[in-house]
C-alpha cells in the first residue's frame, strides 16, 4: 500500500516517496512533504541545471548550489532557470 503525503511542491495530496531520496534532515523533510511527481519534477530541473551550468556533482561548491536550488524548487517554488535557457520542447 502506498503512502499519501500533502506535497508542498504540488500543493495537493499525492503518492509519497518510498524512501528518503537525500541524506540528513533535508532528506527526511523531502520524504515527509514531497510526492513522487514533485521529486521527478526536481530531478528534471536538476538535470537542466547541471547541463546548462556545466556543473559537476563531485564539486562541493556545485553540490551546495544544487542543494540550495533543491530547497528553492521544492519548498519555496521560486527556482529560476539559467539565463538564456531555451526549452527544447518550446513549452515555456
UniProtKB/Swiss-Prot annotation:
One Gene Ontology BP term is: cellular response to oxidative stress
Q: Which InterPro entries match?
A: Fe_traffick_prot_YggX, Fe_traffick_prot_YggX_sf
Q: Which GO terms describe its molecular function?
A: iron ion binding
Query: Which keywords does UniProt give here?
Result: Iron
According to its UniProt entry, the function of this protein is described as: Could be a mediator in iron transactions between iron acquisition and iron-requiring processes, such as synthesis and/or repair of Fe-S clusters in biosynthetic enzymes.
Concerning HAMAP family, the annotation shows:
Fe_traffic_YggX
User: Mind telling me what this protein is named?
Assistant: Probable Fe(2+)-trafficking protein
Originating organism: Xanthomonas campestris pv. campestris (strain ATCC 33913 / DSM 3586 / NCPPB 528 / LMG 568 / P 25)
Amino acid at each position: 500500500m502506498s503512502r499519501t503525503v500533502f506535497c508542498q511542491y504540488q500543493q495537493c495530496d499525492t503518492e509519497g516517496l518510498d524512501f528518503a531520496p537525500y541524506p540528513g534532515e533535508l532528506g527526511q523533510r523531502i520524504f515527509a512533504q514531497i510526492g513522487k511527481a514533485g521529486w521527478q519534477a526536481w530531478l528534471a530541473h536538476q538535470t537542466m541545471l547541471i547541463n546548462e551550468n556545466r556543473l559537476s556533482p563531485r564539486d562541493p561548491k556545485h553540490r551546495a548550489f544544487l542543494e540550495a536550488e533543491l530547497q528553492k524548487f521544492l519548498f519555496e517554488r521560486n527556482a529560476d532557470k539559467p539565463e538564456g535557457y531555451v526549452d527544447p520542447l518550446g513549452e515555456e
